[in-house]
Amino acid sequence: MQDELNLEPAVVWVVDNTQRKTIKDAARFGEIEHVFTDVQYDDPVAHAREVLKDFREGDYLCMIGDPKLSAVCVGVLAQNNPGNEIKLLQFDSRTFQYFPVYLNF
């Protein structure tokens, strides 16, 4: 999908690089980038701030993996984008597809 504002492709920011879940369907929403990898982080909030500084309005956050890391990412995006919509991708286990969910803070 193209970002309506600047024609750059959207990015799907995958919270946790887990091998147990598939993200193949999420790629239809944009280019895949990982916020956290298998490395342990002393300060996950600082790491998420650094990685998500490039999050644009047309991007998505794919909340997969550790719920604490998902909460960190949503908190960082809410702080960095006050009043703007945050697009999340949620997995539907019946259809094996992701669908968008929209949040406004």
Describe every region a protein language model picked out.
Residues 63:
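Short, surface-exposed polybasic-aromatic patches that bind anionic ligands, especially phosphate groups
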Residues 1-60, 72-105:
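Long, low-complexity, Lys/Arg-enriched
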